Design a protein with these regions (language model features):
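ABC ATPase "signature
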Residues: 186-187
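Helix-to-loop junction immediately C-terminal to a conserved catalytic motif
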Residues: 14
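A short, proline-enriched helix->beta-strand linker immediately N-terminal to the Walker B motif
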Residues: 121-125
Length: 209
């Protein structure tokens, strides 16, 4: 399975579970899932950044500090350089005014946007989203989806697990429907999310509509 940089996609990332077979290519790193070392796994993971459904922010650090932590620790930026870049990323997700606030003072939608800015900080070849709106109140979902829409417009490669079907239809160029670890249907959003000959897919679409 190959992911071309700069194309928004929608499917499940195999290394979140132990894979049975296949080849994964992200950026310039390729991993044969039938036989790989911890070093190869680490190299592949360095090509990605994860956005969790429950934010996973450091509660004792401000929004800006959450974004700059990896820049200082891993990219060896100076604190000043990291703060300048971190503020630019927070501005990108509409949160520059909240830079000095702690997570406890932010709404769920704002926390998730900080999480997205933090993921962008490491400049990954692919952003991985695990149900990014499932922990949010309905009125906060839109602000997070809008940030992801903007990333898609900028041709950011994204791997998103979601139940937001209308959103998937808008931003994805490829959709994979999975159940119990098996791919049941895949194709363009129109092919997968419209009427289909796949009975299980039809059942799912009816249940969410």
């Amino acid at each position: 399975m190959e992911m071309s940089e700069g194309i928004p996609v929608l499917f499940f990332f195999p290394l979140l579970e132990e894979p049975d077979s296949g080849v994964i290519t992200i950026g310039e790193v390729t991993l044969d899932t039938s036989k790989y070392t911890k070093k190869e796994e680490y190299q592949l993971r360095q090509q990605t950044a994860m956005v969790f459904q429950n934010y996973n922010l450091f509660r004792n650090k401000t929004a800006l500090e959450n974004v700059t932590e990896s820049l200082v620790a891993n990219k060896k930026m100076s604190k000043k350089e990291a703060e300048t870049y971190g503020l630019a990323l927070l501005n990108r997700v509409g949160l520059s005014a909240q830079a000095k606030q702690y997570p406890v003072t932010l709404s769920g939608g704002q926390q998730q946007r900080v999480s997205i800015a933090r993921a962008l900080a490491v400049e990954p070849h692919a952003l991985l989203f695990d149900e990014p709106t499932s922990a949010l109140d309905p009125e906060l979902v839109g602000e997070v989806l809008q940030v992801i829409r903007e990333l898609a417009k900028q041709e950011t490669t994204m791997v998103i697990v979601t139940h937001e079907m209308q959103f998937a239809k808008e931003v994805a160029n490829r959709v994979v429907f999975m159940e119990d670890g098996k791919i049941l249907h895949e194709g363009t959003p129109e092919e997968v999310l419209s009427s289909t000959t796949n009975a299980r897919m039809n059942q799912f679409l009816k249940s969410i509509n």
